[in-house]
Amino acid sequence: MSGIVVGVDGSGHSQRALEQAMKEAAIRHVPLTVLTVHEAVRGYYGHMTMYADDPDRTEEARKAAQAEVDEVLAGLDGPRPDSVTVTAVHGYPVEELINAGKDADMIVLGSRGAGGFTRLMMGSVSSQVPQHAHCPVIIVPPENRG
């Protein structure tokens, strides 16, 4: 998929990333793919455990992402992306974002600012995706950073 891929999870951080991705897609006149991942469960010690896909939960995640897109579009000043596609998948966020970005021009992610022990145990999508992505990755910092 060419264009821009943005990962969303319903957080304020992902909403900021979505806003930035919409602006980038509009400026560049490229399609925007909004990807939400119905996440596999993480085990107690940080090991991933994959459970069977639940189509109902994945569809709920897609609808939530669509609502987030609609909200951001409603408040967007200026140009809008030529097209916006919302996709929901089941899996591990880092892997799914890297796969979605294989043919993309850019990936946009929000930053939660996790650090220390949390990052060591769980890793961070915004720190792992740039290391393995096949395209440029923009990390949108938290609003209160400064």
Task: Indicate residue ranges for each PLM-predicted region.
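Hydrophobic structural packing positions in well-ordered secondary structure
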Residues: I4, A21, L32, L97, ...
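Short, hinge-like loop/turn segments at secondary-structure boundaries
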Residues: T49-D53, A104-D105
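Small/aliphatic-rich secondary-structure junction motif
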Residues: S2-Y51, V84
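Glycine-rich, Arg-bearing micro-motifs that act as flexible, cationic patches
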Residues: M106-Q131, G146
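Structural beta-alpha unit
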Residues: H13, A74-I107, N144-G146
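General small-molecule cofactor/ligand-binding pocket signal
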Residues: L35, T85-V89, I138
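A short acidic, glycine-rich active-site loop
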Residues: A52-A67
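Short secondary-structure boundary segments
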Residues: T36, S111-R112, P141-P142
